[in-house]
Amino acid sequence: MKINLYYWNNGVGVVNHSKLIKTLLYEYDVISYDISIKNEYRKSDLGIFIQNILPDELSNNKKNIYIVCEEWLTDFEMSHIDWFDYIFVHSNHAKNLLSLYHKNVINTGFFSLDRYFFPTNTKELLHLKGKSIQKNTELVWNYKKDTNILDSSHKYLSENELIHELNRHDIHICCSLYESWGHYLWEAMSCGKLVICSEIPVFKEYLNPELVKFVPIKNIYDFVINYEFLNTKNYKFRKGYFVDNFKFNELLNNKENLFEFQKRNSDNIRQHFLDVNKTNKQKFLETIKFIL
């Protein structure tokens, strides 16, 4: 069976997602196409589009799947959503949103890279912004004396450097305004590290509240002019989940308790990552087999 995998090389999560999917589908004849450059596309049994679409290429494939992160769906993409046979999403929250627009929306979950590599305990905190505009870095700047902030817009991290930072820091702050999943959070957990995260829908679905530190949501906004992620009306499903600053401050004022929690629960945190990753990989594979 031939599968064409289409993705836009954004230099971050989408690229990793495409690699993960191609590796998982090793039993099939898979070709990956970076649609940010010109390509000659073959005909296939199944086309899988990750976030970005090429409407003119759908006819090359007998069936087509669209994998979406709902917060990045544009009006253009929404206008073509019914051209696809199936829509894959990462959570029941997203399924409920998009089932109003398509009859075959399937929650396949998500899976991330296992970054475990001889983790150490340094009693340090990290906020890995990467290139993202939705990690709520504005919140963490107020605590930069206590937290290392890595911004890929200013300093590029190699793959080895990224793995080193994930394994070196005991606590990772990921109070995202919104995520349809969240590679950073899961990759940190793969190293047995404690994550402080916002109580947004997808995190609540998949995370064990006994193994992470949730920060309650105080307000939800569609538009906030001072936040790049929310300073637009171009994305129908985009919302910003703002955490309770007081509760966040309370957590950071008890860092020693957090470090002890991480050390005590490290193995269980990693096992939770492994369990969810395995379950969602199986679900994805079984769904592909059903469709083909």
Regions found by a protein language model. Name each.
Residues D114-E159:
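Conserved catalytic-core segment of nucleotide-activated headgroup transferases in glycan assembly
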Residues L177:
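Aromatic "clamp/platform" in nucleotide-sugar-dependent glycosyltransferases that forms part
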Residues T232-F290:
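A charged, aromatic-enriched C-terminal amphipathic alpha-helix characteristic of glycosyltransferases
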Residues L194-C197, K204:
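Short hydrophobic beta-strand element within catalytic cores of glycosyltransferases
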Residues D170, G192, E199:
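A short alpha->beta transition loop at the rim of the catalytic pocket in nucleotide-sugar-dependent
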Residues M1-I53, T232-K233, K278-Q282:
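N-terminal pre-catalytic "stem/leader" segment of glycosyltransferase-like enzymes
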Residues F76-M78, S99-L100, F110-E124:
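Acidic anion/phosphate-binding donor-loop and adjacent secondary structure
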